[in-house]
């Protein structure tokens, strides 16, 4: 794992000397968060077969991770100054352990619902603890370190995808869940007995924040965030079910997409220095639409090429939207950013069961038309992707309008928005 070397740097006054160790712990905890996304995506079919639950029910199970995340993020953000990052990190550890153990010993649908909620809550707790902690530990290079921290979300998805792809058959889904206990225990060891930084956050004017939430630009982005999250997660979280019969390895597709996202975000500044945030969002929506269309029409090796286009589309969605709000509606403050990230994750609580229903209906229709086995699965997967394409297509229109509206306003370079420290406050900023 790469951690920015600071051995020759002077640690600022008031910052604990063990900040490198805490930063490493934060990165490992984010890897656990990402692995839960990747491995869950890889075992959905097996969970359905093991517990005899439908695609709609699998959608509800999936949605619990996206519900637990914003709940923890909002609660953690509200109590951070009172309890500090140490207690939030231990809350994340306990929730991760509970979620993983309860998943292994789940007896059916409701067991999976409860265990997946705990995992989502743990993931949100990691974000609530680590982002402000890193800001407090590295006041001299906040952007740089937050950027490197959040690379480990797509990086962790690559790790989880490869583990599931190469070891899933031999270990089974329970074995894959147990593997995630290894990095979970590692980050607990790294934080045990350590001194944590004191919060140096300035208390914002909450009344002004609430007024900022009524800004038309903020409300516009609030609506768009639900669609950008759906564009990304509706495909990546259902990749195994949708692309399983396409002739490509679904988890390798997920690893490819996540690897490109990590690389793209790591080098975000030089790549898109000349573009403004609205332009980045518009181009991203166009590429995402093309990518999902290609995924719904291609098979075999062409799926990997289609995945590259899709990855380029979703790469900058989330962090650029958070950066846009930070730059153009600053009055909304940290509250606005927290709610924006929360609605992005919460939207998948709504959409996951819907997508499961689409997949189930398409499979039934294909079977009724005479298709069987892999052929029926392929037809159903393609039809489901063709329904999902409406998410980014709507964004093409919305972000196109935003681009022309913003042309006559003072612009902020896209790299400033993408790499803004405040824009890194959710995992979406690195997903």
Mark where each language-model region is.
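Extracytoplasmic gate region of multi-pass secondary transporters
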Residues: 40-41, 214-263, 349-356
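Extracytoplasmic
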Residues: 21-55, 235-240, 351-355
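Symmetry-related core transmembrane helices of the 12-TM Major Facilitator Superfamily/SLC fold
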Residues: 174-192, 382-404
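Cytoplasmic helix-loop-helix junction between adjacent transmembrane helices
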Residues: 115-151
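Residue-level signature of mid-helix packing/kink "hotspots" within the transmembrane helices
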Residues: 38, 66-74, 158, 258-266, ...
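Helix-breaking motifs and short loop linkers at transmembrane-helix boundaries and internal kinks
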Residues: 52, 84, 105-110, 139, ...
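Conserved MFS/SLC helix-loop-helix module at the cytosolic interface between two early adjacent transmembrane helices
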Residues: 71-110
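Helix-loop-helix hairpin linking two adjacent transmembrane segments in secondary transporters
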Residues: 140-141, 145-199
